[in-house]
Design a protein with these regions (language model features):
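Membrane-interface helix termini and inter-helical loops of multi-pass transporters
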Residues: 11-17, 43, 71-77, 130-143, ...
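Hydrophobic transmembrane alpha-helices of secondary-active transporters
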Residues: 22-46, 64, 154-163, 179-203
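Juxtamembrane helix-boundary/capping and inter-helix hinge elements in multi-pass membrane proteins
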Residues: 40, 47-51, 74-79, 100-109, ...
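Entry/N-cap segments of selected transmembrane alpha helices
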Residues: 41-71, 81-82, 119, 147, ...
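Single conserved hydrophobic/aromatic residue that forms the stacking wall/gate
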Residues: 2-13
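Generic transmembrane alpha-helix signature in multi-pass membrane proteins
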Residues: 67-74, 82-87, 94-107, 111-114, ...
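Membrane-embedded alpha-helical segments of transport systems
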Residues: 58-63, 89-91, 110-130, 148-153
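The feature identifies polytopic integral membrane transport proteins across all domains of life
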Residues: 49-56, 77-89, 106-115, 140-143, ...
Length: 220
């Protein structure tokens, strides 16, 4: 859905003027996530360590393997394969928490797993991506590590610190965070998609099918 929405919005951004700011926008989203985190979000690590470990293993073992299987099964080209594998090697993000809530699942456990996998991402994702994707594209794990640290980890830590120091003020503005995050994410996807509109138009169906299968199998 994001791809279809952004494909239409891409006409507004024909010059892709947002592309230079994609990293900043991602940082804004991660900072917003950090503002919503507190020590209690990690409490399930101590209360139910086995379940948390299973969730982390599922995220960083099963999801990449599922992505790799789908890439091979559909015979995707190198660039599409790299994109699908990157999705499989990245943490679930807040969307997994939303799905847990809508499905009446264990939201506290989901939040804890999401928080842990996001923090582990700088260490785990580059190595995983190199392992599965180096046969398709050139991968620099060190550069990827620092990129994730700067764009993901540092903004999250900054958000956690601000929340700890100015919690009262944060509570007043946190209600606006979902809207800000949605705007930032749509802007990011729109900028990236509009820059490769022709290529995406050619492969939209297969991308949608593979990503949908990856998500559905993963949520099982």
């Amino acid at each position: 859905r994001d791809c279809l929405l952004s494909r239409g919005l891409g006409d507004v951004y024909k010059r892709q003027f947002l592309l230079p700011y994609v990293s900043i926008l991602l940082g804004v989203v991660m900072f917003g996530m950090g503002l919503t985190l507190s020590p209690k979000d990690f409490s399930e690590v101590f209360h139910r360590p086995i379940q948390v470990i299973i969730g982390i293993v599922g995220q960083f073992v099963l999801m990449p393997l599922i992505a790799f299987f789908l890439v091979k099964a559909f015979g995707l080209s190198a660039d599409l394969a790299a994109g699908v594998l990157l999705v499989g090697c990245c943490p679930g993000g807040t969307s997994s928490n939303v799905m847990s809530y809508l499905g009446k699942g264990d939201v506290p456990l989901s939040v804890t797993i999401t928080s842990c996998t996001t923090i582990l991402a700088p260490l785990v994702t580059p190595g995983l991506f190199w392992l599965f994707a180096h046969q398709y594209i050139e991968v620099d794990p060190a550069a990827m590590f620092w990129s994730i640290v700067k764009i993901v980890l540092l903004p999250i830590i900054g958000g956690v610190v601000v929340n700890a120091l100015f919690g009262t003020v944060v509570k007043k503005v946190v209600v606006a965070l979902p809207l800000i995050s949605v705007f930032a994410i749509i802007s990011i996807v729109t900028a990236v998609v509009s820059a490769s509109a022709e290529r995406i138009a050619e492969t939209a169906l297969i991308i949608f099918l593979v990503v949908a299968l990856h998500n559905c199998i993963g949520y099982l």
